[in-house]
Amino acid sequence: FLSVWNEAAEEGARGASVDNINTLFVACLSATGTETTLTEANPAAPVAPAVIADAGLTATQLAIKATIKKADDSYRIRFMTPVRSKIGITIAARVPTSYVATDVEAQIREAILAEYGQAAAASRRGYNRPLYQRVYALLKQKIVALSGGNADLVVTIQDVPTMAGRPELWRYVAADSLAVTVAT
């Protein structure tokens, strides 16, 4: 996960401060996963990121800092803890009786988790927000049972206003935040 933002985005999320002038903010989690993260269990109760002191930076964070400094050494760089936040998605599908409901349910889960799960490329960038249009198109493209004229699909994506403009959020769909029902 990697998210980099400037003082305007930071002040949009947490208010103005003179400490933010000429600062780039970074929240990251490397492949080794040694960086500290916070978890937001309830999106209606936001968890604020913590500032990571320079002495507590990991090798990955130090490499990111060096790369930014090499490109432009006029910026101050402040690392923040990423905040994990699961995206709740509910999918209700109706398919023709010629399909096995449990098989279609497994295909839906596989498609959503591949596209929006924790390991997905889209989730590893900041500001991940599944859009209804993309979810419907993805499911109809990947799952034959949903592409026919006798299939129906209803998708509900949890969207909490407090999530808007929070660049430190690592948002992804998890197996336990995805509810799927399929009827024939």
Protein language model regions, located:
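Carbohydrate-recognition loop of C-type lectin domains
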Residues: 1-129
